[in-house]
Design a protein with these regions (language model features):
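Charge-rich, low-complexity intrinsically disordered segments
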Residues: 12-26, 262-313
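A structured, charge-rich N-terminal accessory region that forms the first stable segment of a protein
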Residues: 2-84
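A short, highly charged nucleic-acid-interacting micro-segment common to nuclease
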Residues: 84-108, 127-130
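Acidic, metal/cofactor-coordinating or nucleic-acid-engaging core segments within structured domains
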Residues: 168-251
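A short acidic/basic microdomain associated with nuclease active sites
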Residues: 114-133
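Short, solvent-exposed loop/turn segments that connect beta-strands within catalytic domains
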Residues: 119, 145-151
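Active-site-adjacent loop/helix micro-motif of nuclease/hydrolase catalytic cores
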Residues: 161-172, 262-269
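Conserved catalytic cores of phosphodiester-cleaving nucleases, focusing on short active-site segments
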Residues: 111, 140-142, 151-159
Length: 313
């Protein structure tokens, strides 16, 4: 019998994917650049529906999800659970214009539902890292098997007002920053110390919380990785290189824009690619890939966020 987890994954793919990820646009001979467009006539309602109904899948844990009543009206059950979780200790209510959960939920949808990967960190386990570290962690961490080998997907997301802001904030996540004297003032997330600490030192130790939803072969590959790190005293990046596993980096942004074709904003994509190519050298990583994914909206980010939280009162 299918688990509630599997039932919901299929439900979102059938009922929600087309709302915001209807058509993927590319640029010929460039595998890095992606844009999703959709039917803009119901944009606010579609963002609201996706956020409200996906919220339990993103926030709740696997053990709680198995008790959801999905036999009759799945939408009603998800809205009920969404409202309960919104007011629970799981969720800290903050200023909607600053709270990262909006973008984080949609990049999770992209990674798990559209791209069909599996999460490596639950919302609750990720918060444990946030509670004790100045660096708040990578926005989304997932994994899959690619030609039989482990691929770890590390994603950063911005849900902001403009394309320029999205580009600038994504580059800020990528690059180390220095003062006028050449002293390091902020480590970007594409930094070996940051990645070794967050993924190797924290995330891989949390796999008990998500292991029930991983395919056995995927779980075995993660065990190989942990063996290299724990028993053989390799860093995460050294272990990835030794096993020839891949990291896929996804930089995702949602912003208001009249441009609905990636060719019209190619320079913004290219600036992020240039930043990534400059910083990736520091990692010493042998096997990696890059996706830059944009969703342009008609409505402002603030209006979309206000619409999404209407049901919570």
């Amino acid at each position: 019998m299918e688990s509630n987890y599997e039932i919901l994954k299929k439900f979102y793919k059938i009922n929600h994917k087309q709302l915001l990820f209807l058509e993927e646009k590319h640029i010929e001979n460039n595998n890095f650049i992606h844009m999703y467009v959709y039917d803009y006539t119901n944009e606010l309602e579609n963002f609201k529906k996706t956020f409200n109904e996906y919220f339990p899948f993103y926030v709740d844990n696997y053990d709680s999800m198995k008790y959801y009543n999905l036999d009759k009206n799945i939408e009603e059950e998800l809205i009920k659970q969404s409202k309960k979780l919104w007011s629970s200790p799981y969720v800290d209510n903050r200023d909607i214009n600053k709270w990262g959960i909006f973008g984080e939920l949609f990049v999770d949808f992209l990674v798990r539902i559209v791209y069909e990967n599996e999460t490596m960190l639950t919302y609750a386990s990720k918060k444990a890292y946030n509670d004790r570290n100045e660096f708040k962690g990578i926005d989304n961490l997932a994994c899959s098997l690619n030609n039989g080998e482990l691929e770890i997907i590390m994603s950063e997301v911005k849900f902001v007002s403009t394309l320029s802001t999205a580009k600038a904030e994504l580059i800020s996540d990528i690059e180390d920053e220095y003062d006028q004297n050449g002293n390091l003032t902020k480590k970007g997330h594409l930094n070996s110390d940051v990645i070794n600490s967050y993924v190797g030192g924290f995330a891989l130790k949390q796999q008990e919380s998500v292991g029930k939803i991983l395919l056995e072969e995927t779980a075995n590959k993660i065990s190989q990785l942990n063996q290299k790190i724990v028993a053989e005293d390799n860093s995460f990046i050294e272990a990835m290189n030794s096993l020839n596993f891949r990291i896929r980096f996804i930089y995702f942004a949602i912003f208001k824009s009249s441009y609905k074709d990636p060719l019209n904003i190619l320079k913004y994509y290219n600036e992020i690619i240039t930043s990534f190519n400059k910083q990736i050298v520091e990692l010493g990583l042998n096997n990696y890939d890059l996706d830059i994914v944009f969703i342009p909206t008609d409505n402002s980010s603030s209006n979309i966020k206000k619409k999404m939280v209407e049901i919570y009162g």
